[in-house]
Every structure is written in C-alpha cells, then in structure tokens.
C-alpha cells in the first residue's frame, strides 16, 4: 500500500485543542456562540457538569451568563461584569457566587475569553470556571434549589439587611477610590458616569439592577461623543442581539423573581467596572511574554477619552489571542477608543471604584486591544501555542520539518536504499577478499588504506548515513491516532525509542577508527556491523510487500544476497587454511591446479581475486539449489562442515520460497488486488462523471483512510457467514464501549444488549462531510464515539458536540420521523454509532421492562427535530388522523341540529351513529358500511371534517331508533368526538353521514313487529347547504368542476324526488304493517348482483308518525348524493323510472321468507 500519510485533510481542531489544553488541568469551561441570541451555550465539558450538578443536555442552549446558577447570594455587580464582557467582546475575570442544582453555594472565578475566526471576528466565548471557596457563612440560607421560586425565609432576610461579599480583588482597589470620587461628578446625570448601587438586596428592584436595554441606552449616550460609525458599531450589537434581555430557552424562575423589572430577562445584568481595569495589562500569547511583562511592569497613569491606541506606554506587541491577530500585527493603525467612567456614588467601606477609566471599544473593530489578566494568559497559553481559531486548519507543520510523504523524502529514501544495497554487497566482499590482499602487500607500502577506491566510497556512504540520521530527527511521522506529528521534540523522542540505536551503530566507520592498529581481522569483523543497515531495507520495502511482482523480485534478490554472503565465507575458510596446510588438498589449491595458477612454496601466487570469487559463488549457488556437479568439492573437514550448512540452508530456502512462490504471491496479492480494484472503480467513476479536482481528492483520501480503517473488510459480509448468536457476540464486542459507558444502556439485560448491538451501525466521517442536511428525515439516533461535530442553522453554529454526545430526536414522543432543523457537519475525523428508529423501537418493544428506563435516562444533547415545519407540533394521533382526513375530506355535509344534546334515550342516526365510536361487532362483518361501499367512496363523518364549526346548520329530518340508555362514559352522537374517535371512524363507519339515515330504514326490516320510527321535530333554521368544500384550500377541485358536480347532483335529486313521491304511499304502508317486503329499487346508476342476507341486528323502535313529502325529500337528497361516484363529473340524466311492484295480497307476505330484490344495494 502507499505510504501512510495520516490525517492531512484540513480539520477544525478547535474543540480538540481546547479540551487538550483544559482537560489536562482539570478545567471546567463552557463554549458559547457570540452570534446567536443570549450567547447560547454550545458546548460544556464534564468538569463543568460535575461542578454545577446539571447534565450536558440541561446546560446546552442556555445563556452563557449562567443565570440558571444564580441564587439569593449571587452578586448583581458580578453578573453585570460578565454581561459587559460579553457585550463588549472583551476579556474579563470575575468572582461571583453560583448555586449548584442541589442548592449548595460556591464562590467561583469566571474567565471570559473571546474566540475569533480567520477574519478576526469574535464568534465564540470561552468561560472558564474555577472554584475559589465553598460559601458557608453564618446566617446563610438553607440549600435552595435554583429551579423553584425564592423562599420567604431568605427573601425576608434579604430585605432586612444588605448582603455584601468581600471580594479580595475588589478590596485591593479601595485605596484608589478617593481620586475617582473627587474627580467625578456627584450627580447621576453627569456625562460619562453611570450610577451603580451596591445594595445587593435580592428581592426588591433597585438602581443597581440595570437591564440590558438601560445598558444599551448608556452606550448610546457615550457613543455620541465619537463618530457616527463608532456609535453605530457600539450600540448595534447591544440592541440587535442582546445577551440577557431576551429569556433563553431555559429561563430561571428565581432570576425572574429576583428582578421583576428586567423586561422579561432571565437575569438583570449591568455594565460595571472589573478589577482588572485599574491598569493596562498587556496581552500575552505565550508564557515567555508573561515573564517579559512581569519584568517590565510599571504603574500606568489613568486613561482618558483622548488616549489613543498608540499610547507611548503601551506595548508594541499586539494584544492577541489568536493566530490572525499575530499575522496582522504590522498592519494596525491608530484605533479610536471610547471610555466610560463607572463611579460608585454610595459610600461603601468594602467596595470601591477604581481610579482609571474603563475602555469599551466597538466590537466591530477587529484590531482592538484588550486588558488581559495574567491568569487567563496562563490558562490559554501553553508554551508557544495561542488560543485556537474556529476554522478549518491544515495540520500545522513546524519550520524546517520534512513531511514523511514529501517528494524530497521519497527521493532520499530511494538513495539510502541504494546505499544500503551497496553496503550489503561490498562489506562482506571487502572483509573477505580485499583485506587479505592488503595484508599480503599487494599495494604499495607507502600507500595507506585510504588510497583504495572502495575505501573512499565507504567513507562517502558513512557520511550519507550520518546525514540520514539528522534528517530522521526532522521527519514527521504518524502516531497511533492517525495524526501527523511535526514537533521536533516529539519526533526526537519517537526516533530515540525506535531505530536510532541501530542506525547509529550501522553508521560508525569502524575501519577508520581502528586504522593503523594492524588488526585486519578485527577490522573485517567490525565492518560487518554495517549489515545492520539492512533493517532499513525492511522498513522501506515493507510498503511494497503486497505487490506480487515486488515480492518475487525481493525473494530473488534475497536468495542471491545469501549466496553472495556464503561465497565470501567459503573463500574465507579456504584462505584461512591454505597457509597452514602441508598437503595441498584445499579447494583453492585444486582451483589453482585446474586453471594453471598454482600456489608456490611460499604461499604466494595462485588464482586471481576474480577467479576465486566466481568459483566460490558458483559453488554456493549449486549447493543451495541442490544441482551441484562436483567440479568444486569440499575436501577438508571445515569445508565439508560448511557445505553441510549450505545444503541445509538451501533445502529450507528452496522448499519455503521457490516451492511456494505462487502461494505467497496469491496470499500477499489478495488484499492488494481488492484495494486496487476498488481504487480503480473510484477513479473510473471520477473520470466518467468528471468530478472536479477538490472533490476528487476528498474521494480518494476518504477511500484510502477508510481502507486503512477497515482494511478492506466488509463487516456485513463477514458476519453473514456466522450464526446469529455468534454475530450478536461480535457486535456486542464491537459496540462494547458505547453500551458500557452510555447511561441509557445501563441496567439492560444481556439479551437486550445483544439485540441492540445487532442493530447498531458504525459510521466514519472525514472532516467537512455533512452527516445530516437541513430538512432531511431523522430516521436514526446518533452516538458520537470519537471526534467532534458542529450543528449549523444556515451559517450560524448552534452547537458543538464531542465524544459521548447524542443527537437526533426523541423517538418516543413522535410517531412519525421529523425533519432536521440544521446541518450536522464533521469537524474532525469522526466515528459515530447510529441506530435506526424502527430498529430501536422494535428492540424496546421486545423488552418493555427496559423501555421505560431507556426513555427516562436518555438525554439527547441536541434535538434536531424541526417543530416549525409542522404547525403546533401535533402528536402522532393528530398526524395519522390528519393524514386519513386528507383522503376523505372530499365532500362533507352540514348535518347538525340546533340542539347540541339529544334526549337520553335517543341515538343519532344522521350523526356518527351510536355513542360508542369505533369498530364493533355490528361493523366488523361489513367491509364498507351497511351497503358494502368503501369508506373512501362516500362522504366523511362529521368528525372527519375540520371545516365545520359551531355555526353549521343541521338536517331538517332525523330518524332515530329507541334504544337503551347510554353508558355514562359515552358521548352523544351530536357532540364532538376525540382524536381516537376520529381515527376509529375512519376505519369502520357503518352509519356514515346522512346516508346512514336512509340505510337504517332498510336495515331494520324483518320480523320486527311493534317497532316504529318516529320523526324528530323540524328545525326552524334555514335550509342547509349540501356541500362544505373550501374552494381556496390546496388540493381541492377547481371552482368550475365543483359547479358542474352541483348541477349534476341537482338533476339527480329532482329525479329521485319524483320517484320517491310516487312510491311514498306504498313505503308508508309497509312500515305501518311491519311486514317483510322488498325495498324499493330507486338506484338509477348500477344494479349490483345478489348478495348475502343482511345480518344487521334489529333494534326496537317507537311509533312513527306519517312522513311528509318535504321530510322524505331531504332523505332523497342524501341518498342521491351518496350514490354519486367519487370521480364522475356528470351523472346520467335520463333513464326509466323504476317503481315498486307489489303483490296483490299484502297480508299473505307476512308469513313468507324475506327475498331481497336484485337492485337493492343492501343485498
């Protein structure tokens, strides 16, 4: 695979940097967005949650003024100082008394620090909290919870005496109060002076309690002294985006009760003077600047409004806490300043005003100066680092540092590789062959060892290796977190722990150090220490170990290198035995005799070096491959022992390497083949769709990183080959960190955890990727396990989430998934666990005993559901019933009597039917009502229409049967029904609309002797309108279509009225005689086939008076309207008039069985 480049994509490491700096010091801090209302909290660490007792979900989106921590002993002056720092986007350090969730009070030191983006604009605030002491004073009220109203005990005590906290920082300024009091105007209305009352009575409002609108007005007054542009810049942020004048999402009842005149603000804040304003303290960006400031600290005179930005005593260093300010240091010109004098006119021996003026500079001026406390600088400045900026930052590379994947480093590595190969070849050769020649005096006696050409090359190689060691001290590396480390100190430590010792030993020129000592054997042995450089080959060539061709080439080179080393050893053995051997039987003597260059009696002469090396290499290759011919044979015992070792090595190498070359290549090449296949597909996709270069780079980088993260393993494909029990165990192991440390999953049974683990999916996101877009359906719940993300609404950051945070929507509150109200974008490389809502609900349904615990302990850090898209945020029943109503609200009638209630013994037949609404025994066997029609073909029930109001008129005719009294819990048919009733009526509605009144006439025919229908009194109200169709609502038919339908209905009603008037006498006779007769065939549209006998229950009725033509005319209208098809614009106008044919003797029919006519819709 290619070299590991690490995380080289630009990342927003703001949150990680803050956590790294603060968490190591056990800091407690929150991060607030300066661009949203009330400077809402978008992040809080675990230390702050432990300090205040609130969970992260309870703190998120609250005002960063921490009004929910206020209590009876919270100083309003201190709260005003925090608000002033937030309004002025300045750094401040305030001591204030806060209350925990359990009611305990503690004195806290708050550091307010602004954070800038790359443009220099303040977009966030960091508030660091440091506990000074636990407040336990005499007469202190009992522990009081912050979320309830103030008790009468401490309210009464607060009115009795004034509470004054002796702040050490403010007491130190008492000596400087006199010049300010004498030099200031004594009236509250003096220009530039603001009266601040020190009385801290918590109950009654006082002049000390200045709301934010008063502060804005005060800014207006002072800003009038400067240019118009400065005045607008000063007043704009305070008036447009107030910090405390608008209640936050979690208003504190106690804070509102403490300050009733704050215009709805959750806490009454005022701009007051902080203790750090007494002298101008220069901003330091590192610890070195702090020391320099300490050494050169001098008392400064009081400032005035005319003091400019380039004061002679002001330091030339830019007061900066971010990289952008340091870059713009030389471009800053003179900055106009506006000052306010905060004067205390009440004589107070404990609290005093400072002697200097407080500078308030317009927040729009980016290159402004601030007064920075030394504590803030120590907290935020560690070494040479400065406060990070909230922006995408590429990995910071230290100066004079070489990237490990840079082209220079790649060329240098190849050069070092060639030098290592040279060392591996020539070091054994020179130790075995050349030293003996030097010892024999083949070279000139006055020419030293340095005159040899190979010695000069060895010297150059040694120098190159020493230079490589120095380069390794400046080369970046990738740590375990896939981060590129460029800090020289960390690089040196990493190199010392790794390969430094081996590289150092291999780079020592031993032959030069012991040159002239006369021990050539020792030199030859020490020269072999350079073979340690072969470890470099293993390191450099490891990245090519997955390529089949490279592996084959490396195996061949390894085999040749081992043969070369063995040849040098073979020559060394023969050369060592040759002078001490009386009988010339060694392989060197045999070689000299064979080629005609024998050794003389003095041992000189013999074959040349070339002949010796080639013969030795020939013998080792033939022995390693077991194909030796015997022309070079071992004769002495030493030679035979070495030959045995060579044969053993050769057999192992031949069997393990050459015999399995194909298997090795296939095994090593399988992963690489998959990688290159996938990469080829990605590149073909990029080429085919012409993806632009920035997006192409992101695709390739994500693929490479995802491959290194998963190693090309498809987890789903792997798990499919195992049984479900083993899959659950594997998933439980992979998600063990989430299931063990996340609070909602604690207490779950092993089976529940296994079921949940099977449903979780892991998502890996690079920086800059958007996980959820605004408007997307929220189909899953997300748990962050690594990295940080931001949530944006438009371009405004509303939350920054980190490890162990949860975002999504509360699934138990909504039956249908909602839509996201913002974009979720990754700031760094993130790992998230997500579970789909259907899967989660399915598991919780299987384990109901765990469901209640899960929903009660689940704290979603940020709720992404957009409640504005659905007006009123309806419940699931409203959503489902509303969805059904949209399909059925085609046509509706106004059928309601003047009386809202009916008699106790009556059941409405034209309303919803019986008082019990919903499916019952009488409607389960009827698919679409009593006449077999589908629910969507006829008009909807009165409850299914939202258009009908209290003033709708009613039908003049109502036919109701007498029945038993209703149960107490049932509602009458004329009263509005609940949402459940609406939902049930949509499912099964046998007596739907006005049509049900006519259907009841034929439903109760049979052996019901003595049962009569009665006519209700007619309503004096005007005739009702038949249709209630809002033409202007979306999705309705056009006006012309509705008018054409009305004309067709009118014609149909006229025909039906004519038919019914002709058949009325016969119908009344049938009803009075209570005989089973065939109902009249009045349908003029379609004649259905014969159907099953009706099984509707028969209800007793009372006597019915004679029906009039007008009353039955109303019934005919409803019948005609019910028979109208849903999609037919016109109805048939002509057709034969069908009349009822009665037998001659009606009395004989009473004993005959019921035979329904084929045209009867109820058949």
Curated annotation (Swiss-Prot):
Topology of this chain in the membrane: Multi-pass membrane protein
Residue numbers on the Extracellular membrane side: 427-452, 519-522, 571-613, 635-640
Residue spans of biased composition, Polar residues class: 254-271
Protein name: Voltage-gated inwardly rectifying potassium channel KCNH2
Main localisation: membrane
Residues the record marks as carrying a glycan: 600
Domain PAC as annotated: residue spans: 92-144
Cysteines engaged in disulfide bonds, as pairs: none
Residue span(s) of domain PAS: 17-88
